[in-house]
Amino acid sequence: MINAGSSICGAAANWCISAPGTAILSTIVSGDIQGRLEKTADYVRLLIDSQNPTYDYGLKTGTSMAAPHITGALGLLMERFPYLDNAQVRDVLLTTARDLGAAGVDPIYGWGMVDLRRAIEGYGSLRVDTNVVMNQRAGGLKVWEGDAWDDWTNDIGGPGTLTKSGIGWLRLSGDNSFNGAVLREGTLELNGSNTLTSAVDVQGGRFLLNGSLVSTTLTTTGGVSTVSASGVLKDGNLTVNGGVVSFNGMQTGGTTTVGSNGLLKGIGTLGSTRVDGTIAPGNSIGTLTINGDYVQGATGVYAAELAPGGHSDQLHVTGTATLGGTLVALPEPGIYYLGEQFNFIRADGGINGQFAKTDFSAFSPFLQFSLAYGTNGTRIDVARGASLASAATTPNQRAVAAAADLLAINQGLPRPLTQLFPQQVGGVLDGLSGELHAATPLALVEGSRYVRDAVLSRRAGAVAPGADAGDATGAWVQALGGNSRLDGNSNTARTEANSNGLLAGIDHEFSGWQVGVLAGTGRTDVKQQALRAKSKIDNTHFGAYASHNWGGLGLRGGVAWSKHKVKSTRDVDFAGFRDSLSARYNAHTRQALIEAGYRFGGPEAGLEPYLQVARVEVDLKQINERGGAAALHGKVDDTGTTIATAGLRFDKGLKASFQQDSWLHLRGGVGYRRASGDRSQLADLAFANSTTTFAVEGAPIADSAVVAELGLSAWLTPRQQLELGYSGQYGSESRDHSANMRWSVRF
């Protein structure tokens, strides 16, 4: 209840508000006090002798009764709006008051009766320009998961302009009519119907329009603005001078202008539009509608996203589209098919002009994009672009690329290959090359020495101390393991081979000759790690050998034949393509060798210079890989390599001073090896369903290498011998290490 005794605003009406002040129940203090005054030259004071207070309640009227209501309300609102300053909280209280007396602010009741229920929902009016710094979480009844967020649901009017600062989020859910808004940072969201008397100016932060702006211009110079599907810009213009605007709603009765620093995108409907900045229909792939005419100026950019399958951003113009400026095409994930078409402009009233520039640099140069202008539309056509061979840097890559360039588009490989960029092509072509097949025969040539070394280590006349020289028949078994590496070069990949095996032989001496035969099995694993390619080779060996000594002069020789069952696998994996390939085929190795040496020394120690020549020939059968589009078929040329070695061997008996003969011998040697003939090999291959062949080279063997050997031999009994040995060769392009253990017996 209010009367003239509890609310008289007078000249302070603009800062005055009414509150209940009539017949307010209040505490009453009464009673009597006994005291006296004491006066001196320096002071006057009241001395209390006794007091008898009484306390009661009663109804009181006046401004003193009304003031505590206002003070309490202000305290509550300061807690509710911790991000507002004192004057702003006061204005919230004033502008949400319930009008009393004469309409508007009057000298009796001021703004009217305080209304806390309305006040906690935010301003009722912006009486002055107001800068809201949202940097604290709202208090009171507003609960939200964010740090600084609030929702003002009142209908806000007034002559003031709202400036939104701070990182927080302010939502206005009412139907507002104040004097425009400025967004500097954080988020400002308009959900109701807003008929503002000045523009909404987005300078930074994020602006959201889920309601409507009526007869109000939306101008952006920065930040990100989003007009949702329910957002409406009615009888108002949109000016994008900077920042990003995603327009997904409806513009009616206004026009749109995009300045040189602005970006407009979305899937909504706009009025007539002029673009001197950038327009990018869709929010990924989508259509933006211009209900009117469209003009793209000389500085304008149309950024169109193209997705595989012929899907693209599109601009639908109900009037006339006048083109100029630049078209920039942007890719989406996937594979683009040659022959695809992308319709990105449709103008019901016709097309005028053309783009001055086009930019397809975001796509592979192996695709060619061209524009086709029609009466009412514009499209992009996709065709084959630069050749893959133009990006190849090695002979192998150029050979593969030339064959791939000739493949028909429906053969599987051209589609993913044409999506690549030049810096990716080299590695992909290496993986497609099938170089493993060209490297395999060279790995077999390198591994052939294990059989030769076993043959040459059987020498006529090797008799244990105390043994009967008539023991003319011998048998032996040898286990071996080795690792070889062909380093490759700028054109070929590094190739490694790990071998193991078991050889056995029997020989007989007659008339100074030792003649024998051997057989064995083994396994060789060839790997090109960089190319994700490998072969597993099962080996079967047969051979014959003979040797003769004429005093210090020794002559040794032999022949061997090996059959190899090759199981190869390759994995080809690059962007948009994956294939696992395998093949099974046979190969054969034939070799013949002869060695002559002259030994100086006696039974306990000696030196032997020697000269050795070997001829190794390898042939591979037809290769037919199983797999997808990257499968290869073809043949590797026959390989013929001559290997000549000159060196010096030594042996030394190891015996104690009390022993007459040595049962333990140290042996070793060093030599120089030269390879001639086929040091590298070519494979003539073709892709699946293609007859166009290409030649790829495998990693070469070294033309020269240093060879070394070291071992121990021990006579376990007069008829049994155990030998342990190491041999290796070291070339500029290859390395080879092997170890063996052999047990032999004479009988």
Predicted regions located by residue number:
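Outer-membrane translocation/initiation segment of Type V secreted surface proteins
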Residues: 83, 95-153, 157, 312, ...
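Outer membrane beta-barrel transmembrane domains
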Residues: 590, 614, 626, 630-747
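Extracellular beta-strand/loop-rich repeat segments of large surface/secreted proteins
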Residues: 215, 230-237, 251, 255-343, ...
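Short secondary-structure subsegments characteristic of cysteine-rich extracellular domains
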Residues: 44-53, 185, 491-510, 631-639
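Extracellular S/T/G-rich loop segment that most often corresponds to the catalytic His/Ser-adjacent loop
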Residues: 1-75
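Short, charged, surface-exposed loops that flank catalytic or proteolytic processing sites
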Residues: 80-91
